Amino acid sequence: MSEPVLMDRFARKVDYLRMSVTDRCDFRCVYCMAEEMTFLPRQQILSLEEILQVAERFVALGTRKIRLTGGEPLVRAGVVGLCEKIAALPGLRELCMTTNGSQLDKLAAPLFKAGVTRLNISLDSLDPQRFRELTRTGDLHKVIAGIDAANAAGFVHTKLNCVVMHGRNDDEINDLLAFAIDRNLDVSFIEEMPLGIISEHSRAESFYSSDQVRERIAERYTLVPSTDSTQGPSRYWRLAEAPGIRIGFISPHSHNFCGTCNRVRMTVEGRLLLCLGNEHSVDLKAVLRANPGQPEKLEKAIIDAMQLKPWSHNFTHDDGVQVVRFMNMTGG
């Protein structure tokens, strides 16, 4: 008997779901949200039970990888228990989480025990003052303690996510890489995405391409092309000097990954976003709440939604905002 498969109208198999469990965050990163962010009222967001119901239906329809995101997922009460329930779903191969690392010093071990298979940890600077400026509230030492706690808990292939911005942190690329090598971490360098209206800097002026990052790395290291994949948008390389770690480049502007896109996102409000860079969406919260105890209705809504998935986003690296919602509202 063949496995169920979600397919879009371009015959792309969709087997990767990113689920936001909260729009709230203890950081206010300059590229992610406004400093005086207004968060959603509690009644507008999905309950943990509703998030689990969506995960169950997606896995039943062939999803093999789920990533929990935020906001900062670890500030939501009960998230470790949610992880345990999702990780136990028959057929799911990977349960990952993207986090800013601020809570990992106390939660890394419980997450590992709950069945989370891999962590992505955001880290854009190793300078405490600059880190504070970029996150507006963050404590670098606490994040590094969280990274070390993840290693101690048993996580492997933990990945650092670094958003590279010209004039803000591009001078730290190789220092971040050296940090990753020292702790046996993978790292992805990410081009800034034009989500939400920000005031801290001009996106046109701060744009720093993946090609520029590779050129900077080549000043100190030897990059070797790799066929590695984690089912996400990163294109991977390895280093001759440290072959055990992977270097990824997420390039929504300069080398977009739309043609092989295999993922959809769900916001904490229950909006199923078919593309990071478009507003095509389906309100799964409305389906859930109008049809309690009828999982087949939710499955049908998910299957039908695949036909709304566009071929590509329309990101450009000028100052125009293609999508008004902030990254924390989207699910990072």
UniProtKB/Swiss-Prot annotation:
* Residues annotated to bind [4Fe-4S] cluster 2: C258, C261, C275
Tell me the residue numbers annotated for binding [4Fe-4S] cluster 1.
Answer: C25, C29, C32
Single annotated GO MF:
GTP 3',8'-cyclase activity
Give cofactor(s), names only.
[4Fe-4S] cluster
What the entry lists under CDD domains is as follows:
Radical_SAM (cd01335), Twitch_MoaA (cd21117)
Tell me the cofactor note. Binds 2 [4Fe-4S] clusters. Binds 1 [4Fe-4S] cluster coordinated with 3 cysteines and an exchangeable S-adenosyl-L-methionine and 1 [4Fe-4S] cluster coordinated with 3 cysteines and the GTP-derived substrate.
Q: What is its EC number?
A: 4.1.99.22
> Which keywords are on file for this protein?
4Fe-4S, GTP-binding, Iron, Iron-sulfur, Lyase, Metal-binding, Molybdenum cofactor biosynthesis, Nucleotide-binding, S-adenosyl-L-methionine
Binding of S-adenosyl-L-methionine occurs at: Y31, G71, S122, M193
What's a Pfam family this protein contains?
A: Mob_synth_C
Q: Where does GTP bind?
A: R18, R67, T98, K159, R263, V264, R265
What biological-process terms (Gene Ontology) are attached? Mo-molybdopterin cofactor biosynthetic process
Q: Which residues form the Radical SAM core domain?
A: 9-220
Stored PANTHER family: MOLYBDENUM COFACTOR BIOSYNTHESIS PROTEIN 1, MOLYBDOPTERIN COFACTOR SYNTHESIS PROTEIN A
Main function: Catalyzes the cyclization of GTP to (8S)-3',8-cyclo-7,8-dihydroguanosine 5'-triphosphate.
The entry describes its oligomerization and partners as: Monomer and homodimer.
Name the chain's protein: GTP 3',8-cyclase
